[in-house]
Amino acid sequence: MSDYSKVSFQNNGKLKLLIIVGTRPEIIRLAAVIKKTRKYFDVILAHTGQNYDYTLNGVFFHDLELADPEVYLNAVGSDLGETMGNIIAESYKLMAAIKPDAVLVLGDTNSCLSVIGAKRLHIPIFHMEAGNRCKDECLPEETNRRIVDIISDVNMAYSEHARRYLADTGLPKERTYVTGSPMAEVLHMNLAKIEASDIHARLGLEKGKYILLSAHREENIDTEKNFTSLFTAINKMAEKYDMPILYSCHPRSRNRLAASGFELDKRVIQHEPLGFHDYNCLQMNAFAVVSDSGTLPEESSFFTSVGHPFPAVCIRTSTERPEALDKGCFVLAGIDEKSLLQAVDTAVQINLDGDDGLPVPDYVDENVSTKVVKIIQSYTGVVNKMVWRKG
C-alpha cells in the first residue's frame, strides 16, 4: 500500500492546488500553467507514471524547465484495467492524505480519471481542454472526455465549438469558460530555443527535404487492419516522394512494428521520441508533417502565426479540433494509401502556393496560464459553497 504521509503542501496560506499528469501531451500543454500556478498557489504536481520512459517524460521536464513532480503514483499495472484502477485508487489515497483545496487536470488521458476520487472527496475539480469531441467511439479518449467533463466542477474549453458541446451535454454554462489553447504560450516561451536547435545537423537532414512522421495512437497501432493500412501507405509515401521520412517512434509503436514483422521502406528512419525543441524545429522546416498527434492543429496554427507555416497532415478520420479545420490549418488524411498521398500532395501544394490558412483565434492567446489561475482562485470557494454546501 502506498504511503503518502510524507507528501505535504507548504501550507503558506495560499490556495493548495493538486495538478495531476500522466503523459507527454499533458506535460507539454500544462508547462506554462504549472509555472504560473507555482507562483501564485501552493502546488503539488503528481505524475501517475503512465509514460515512465525518459523519452516520453523526463526529457520534457528538462526541455520545458519544469521542476520534477513532488510525487509519482506508480500506477502502471500489468494491463489497462489494472492501470486505470490504480490511477483512481492511488490518486484517491494521495488526495485523502494531502487534502488539496482544488484539483486541476487537462485533457482526456487515463490520468484524468483521478477526478473520480476528487469528486467523492468533495474537492473542486478544474478541467482544461474540456468539451473536445470527435464523435468517434473507437477512440478511448472519447469516453474519458465525457466522464471527466461531467464530473468536473469547472470546465475550461479551448474553443466555442467545445463550449457548445458542453452546453449540449447540459453542463452549467456559468461554470464553463473558453480559455483558449495553452500551446501558443508554451511555444512562444520556447521559440528561440526551437529556432536554435541543431537537430538537422545532428541527424544529417536537409531543411525542406524530409517528411516528419508521428504515428502512435491506439486506434492506428493496436488495430491490425488499421496498422497494416497505415504503414503500407507510409511505405508508398516514401516511394513516391523519395526522401527521408523521420519517424518519431514511441516505444509501444516500435514494439508493435517489431512484433508484426512489418518491413518499413529503407527511407523510413525510426528514431526515439524527440525532445520538445528538436521536434518543433523539425516540424517548422519539414517538407510535410504527417501525424496523428492531437497537438498538430495547435502547432500548425502557431507556426503559421509566427511566419513558419508547414504542410500539416493528420492521419486520422476525425478530429476534436474542428476550429482548426475552420481556418485551414491542417488536412485530415485517413490511413489508406490513396487518401494519405492525396492529402500530402494537397497540403504541400497549398503551402507552396502561399495559402497557409489562418491562425485559429482561440489558439493565439499567450495568457492562458493567467486565465487558469484566476478561474481557479475565483471558483474554488464558489464550488465549495454552491456544490458541496461547505461553510
Predicted ranges, named:
Residues M1-M243, S253-G391:
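Nucleotide-activated sugar donor-binding and catalytic core shared by glycosyltransferases
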